[in-house]
């Protein structure tokens, strides 16, 4: 597909919807695969004799390659057909997932997590390039929200199915089945992928160099704010199952249900908030409404501290769900903001740079949490740090990001 008029976009709506469905499915699989190790952690830790500190390093190792490959991925998306870049990355991360079920040692497990991170690094630059080129401003909120909902539905399904599957067959079967099953997505993508969408350019214009993007105040605001939001999310994604089982003493089955509920709550909030922003913009509001969503959503997510501060398990889980709802409001808009600011010309590079910075939190959050839990023997200060980082991100979006409007390049 190539950029077309508004009326033509309407005629292409079924094809665009098919692409969006496949993108949502891909990101769901993406997040199942990156979060599956945390689901298996209580069982894997015992079988492979891994300490809490080692587990923190293991959980963060995915982000070493995922984060540092973002700049390369952004360049690849602008240089080559992102559809095939996406297909290659998807194959790599699915293979890494399946092979994880065969490992016998700590070192090989880290190597496969590094391969998983490298494969998954292409996803978001591809998403942003396609959405910036083929969705109007008042359509991007819901499109991004549905993709973000996939990041929550994936872990929800993975936590529920994975917990039940591992309780019956063990953790190795879970990884092998997941890796092989994921590959079923590839034939559908090859058939329906938007042809040459990733190399869309405005006629007569050149993509700005990275140094030009880095000169813009808005880029650094989105980098920092997204880092803070990701810290909160990766803290939950990597440590919530372990926390529920070891500190709150839930069974594996109960952990699976509660973890899934938290992810579903976030997905629902994301979808509703994205749809409401689109409706408001279609009715005449500016894209600044997305900035308010990110700021207030992340600010309200600080109630996560109450999860570990209260003794009653029911009250604790209610606070967890409330924090996830608030985070969902944040998650509905942060990528739509980037796509508006960058436009089709800079979407690949800006997204790659932003995702690089944001996902450094995936290196920091699991490892720092593991160190805090090892040092203190409980999770209170780990939750406190996550809450403080979320509040910082809220302030960055509210006061550090200016007007949300397309940057002028060239």
Positions of predicted regions on the chain:
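Juxtamembrane intracellular "pre-TM" segments in multi-pass secondary transporters
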Residues: 5-12, 195-223, 247
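Residue-level signature of mid-helix packing/kink "hotspots" within the transmembrane helices
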Residues: 35, 63-71, 121, 155-156, ...
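Extracytoplasmic gate region of multi-pass secondary transporters
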Residues: 37-38, 217-271, 331, 335
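Helix-breaking motifs and short loop linkers at transmembrane-helix boundaries and internal kinks
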Residues: 49, 81, 102-108, 119, ...
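Conserved MFS/SLC helix-loop-helix module at the cytosolic interface between two early adjacent transmembrane helices
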Residues: 68-104
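Structural signature of the two symmetry-related core transmembrane helices
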Residues: 84-98, 288-305
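Cytoplasmic helix-loop-helix junction between adjacent transmembrane helices
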Residues: 112-153
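Helix-loop-helix hairpin linking two adjacent transmembrane segments in secondary transporters
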Residues: 147-191
């Amino acid at each position: 597909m190539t950029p077309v008029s508004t009326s033509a976009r309407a005629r292409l709506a079924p094809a665009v919807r098919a692409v969006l469905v496949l993108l949502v499915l891909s990101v769901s699989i993406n997040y199942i695969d990156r979060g599956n190790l945390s689901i298996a952690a209580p069982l894997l830790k015992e079988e492979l004799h891994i300490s809490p500190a080692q587990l923190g390093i293991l959980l963060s190792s995915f982000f070493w390659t995922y984060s540092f490959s973002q700049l390369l991925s952004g360049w690849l998306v602008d240089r080559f057909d992102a559809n095939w870049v996406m297909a290659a990355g998807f194959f790599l991360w699915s293979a890494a997932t399946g092979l994880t079920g065969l490992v016998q040692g700590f070192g090989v497990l880290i190597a496969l997590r590094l391969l998983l991170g490298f494969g998954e690094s292409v996803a978001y630059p591809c998403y942003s390039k396609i959405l910036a080129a083929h969705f109007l401003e008042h359509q991007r909120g819901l499109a991004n929200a549905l993709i973000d909902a996939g990041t929550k539905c994936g872990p929800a399904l993975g936590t529920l199915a994975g917990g039940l599957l591992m309780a019956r067959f063990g953790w190795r079967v879970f990884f092998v089945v997941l890796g092989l099953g994921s590959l079923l997505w590839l034939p559908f993508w090859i058939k329906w992928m938007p042809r040459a969408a990733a190399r869309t350019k405005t006629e007569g214009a050149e993509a700005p160099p990275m140094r030009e993007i880095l000169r813009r105040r808005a880029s650094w605001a989105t980098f920092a704010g997204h880092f803070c939001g990701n810290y909160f999310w990766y803290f939950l994604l990597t440590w919530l199952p372990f926390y529920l089982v070891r500190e709150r003493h839930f069974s594996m089955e109960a952990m699976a249900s509660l973890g899934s509920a938290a992810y579903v709550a976030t997905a629902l909030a994301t979808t509703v908030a994205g749809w409401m922003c689109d409706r408001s913009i279609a009715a005449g509001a500016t894209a600044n409404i997305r900035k308010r969503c990110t700021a207030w959503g992340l600010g309200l997510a600080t109630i996560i501290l109450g999860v570990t501060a209260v003794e009653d398990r029911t009250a604790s889980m209610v606070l967890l769900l409330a924090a996830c709802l608030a985070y969902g409001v944040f998650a509905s808009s942060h990528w739509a903001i980037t796509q508006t600011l960058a436009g089709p010309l800079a979407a690949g590079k800006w997204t790659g740079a932003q995702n690089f910075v944001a996902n450094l939190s995936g290196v920091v959050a699991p490892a720092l949490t593991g160190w805090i839990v090892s040092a203190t023997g409980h999770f209170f200060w780990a939750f406190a740090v996550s809450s403080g980082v979320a509040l910082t991100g809220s302030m960055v979006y509210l006061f550090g990001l200016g007007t949300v409007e397309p940057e002028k390049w060239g």
